[in-house]
């Protein structure tokens, strides 16, 4: 169910800062037409930290409605307070989502045992599969392989999104967690190599603006056609790198606006729009990738 190129979907806003649900539906249709293998709603790229609880739940519910069972929908449910992640999980239990993606608690820097207990508490209240999400560059805490292996023994913890960029961990996680545990890259620049080493796919920022290329690349990779996949990967590499020239999702939201995928590139503070000096860099990356 969870494999291939999964998009970490943008949340489009109107100029007044309200969520643009018509724009959200347009994005969903773009991804389904392009062959995207799944959608993460209200993750980091979806600006989860600046949405209210009500907005968060509504964006997930609307995404499920718009997708209408055509591809899996994964809901972001991460927070740095366990009770908040538990609340999101309970609120979304009957939403029709296919899985939840929960980032490690950020800022408060829990121990490895604290991380284990955090995810265990979420798993105990959720009736949908759970995806662990490790991105120490944003959270200041690293979920190590040993607690991942303990968590993988729990019935509804089925996957890990690994955004460390440490490719050595693919084999470590596979050995510790078993063949049935799903490993997804959270780093576009190393995503293809991640699959070459035994991962099942990527949760991608680049996918927001190069959906067909990403879907094709990971389809080829999962078929073992790595040389063909690498040709696409090298063409997209300027995007993989320059979509992080400022904090994501700032660059990708600007790029999506330039491509007409969303009407407004508004972000909620403290995120601000892409610096003007970065416009030509991101535009050139899109040109080099053949999408602009």
From Swiss-Prot:
One GO MF term: 4-hydroxy-tetrahydrodipicolinate synthase activity
Annotated site residues (Part of a proton relay during catalysis) in this chain: 44, 107
Pfam families: DHDPS
A single GO BP: lysine biosynthetic process via diaminopimelate
Catalytic activity: L-aspartate 4-semialdehyde + pyruvate = (2S,4S)-4-hydroxy-2,3,4,5-tetrahydrodipicolinate + H2O + H(+)
Keyword terms of this UniProt record: Amino-acid biosynthesis, Cytoplasm, Diaminopimelate biosynthesis, Lyase, Lysine biosynthesis, Schiff base
CDD domains for this protein: DHDPS (cd00950)
UniProt-annotated catalytic positions: 133, 161
SUPFAM superfamilies: Aldolase
Chief site of localization: cytoplasm
Residues engaged in binding pyruvate: 45, 203
Transmembrane segments: none
Involved pathway(s): Amino-acid biosynthesis; L-lysine biosynthesis via DAP pathway; (S)-tetrahydrodipicolinate from L-aspartate: step 3/4
Keyword Lipid biosynthesis recorded: no
GO CC annotation terms, alphabetical: cytosol
Compartment(s): Cytoplasm
InterPro entries documented for this protein: Aldolase_TIM (IPR013785), DapA (IPR005263), DapA-like (IPR002220), Schiff_base-form_aldolases_AS (IPR020625), Schiff_base-form_aldolases_CS (IPR020624)
Entry EC no(s): 4.3.3.7
Subunit structure: Homotetramer; dimer of dimers.
UniProt-listed PANTHER family: 4-HYDROXY-2-OXOGLUTARATE ALDOLASE, MITOCHONDRIAL, DIHYDRODIPICOLINATE SYNTHASE
NCBIfam families: dapA
Functional note: Catalyzes the condensation of (S)-aspartate-beta-semialdehyde [(S)-ASA] and pyruvate to 4-hydroxy-tetrahydrodipicolinate (HTPA).
Protein name listed in UniProt: 4-hydroxy-tetrahydrodipicolinate synthase
Taxonomic source organism: Vibrio vulnificus (strain CMCP6)
């Amino acid at each position: 169910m969870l494999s291939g190129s999964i998009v970490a979907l943008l949340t489009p806003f109107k100029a007044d800062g309200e969520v643009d649900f018509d724009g959200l539906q347009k994005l969903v249709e773009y991804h389904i037409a392009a062959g995207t293998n799944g959608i993460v709603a209200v993750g980091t790229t979806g600006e989860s930290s600046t949405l209210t609880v009500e907005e968060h739940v509504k964006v997930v519910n609307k995404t499920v409605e718009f997708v209408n069972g055509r591809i899996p929908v994964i809901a972001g449910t991460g927070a740095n307070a366990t009770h908040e992640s538990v609340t999101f999980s309970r609120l979304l239990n009957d939403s029709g989502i296919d899985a939840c993606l929960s980032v490690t608690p950020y800022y408060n820097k829990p121990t490895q045992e604290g991380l284990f207990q955090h995810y265990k508490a979420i798993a105990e209240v959720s009736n949908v599969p759970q995806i662990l999400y490790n991105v120490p560059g944003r959270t200041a805490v690293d979920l190590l392989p040993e607690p991942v292996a303990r968590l993988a023994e729990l019935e509804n913890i089925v996957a890990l999104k690994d955004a460390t960029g440490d490719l050595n961990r693919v084999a470590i996680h596979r050995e510790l967690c078993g063949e049935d545990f799903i490993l997804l890259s959270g780093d576009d620049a190393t995503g293809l190599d991640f699959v070459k080493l035994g991962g099942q796919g990527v949760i991608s920022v680049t996918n927001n603006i190069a959906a067909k290329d990403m879907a094709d690349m990971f389809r080829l990779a999962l078929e073992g056609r790595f040389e063909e996949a690498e040709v696409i990967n090298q063409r997209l590499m300027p995007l993989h790198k320059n979509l992080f020239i400022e904090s994501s999702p700032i660059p990708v939201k600007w790029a999506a606006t330039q491509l007409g995928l969303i009407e407004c590139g508004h972000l909620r503070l403290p995120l601000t729009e892409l610096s003007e000096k970065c416009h030509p860099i991101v535009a050139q990356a899109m040109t080099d990738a053949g999408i602009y």
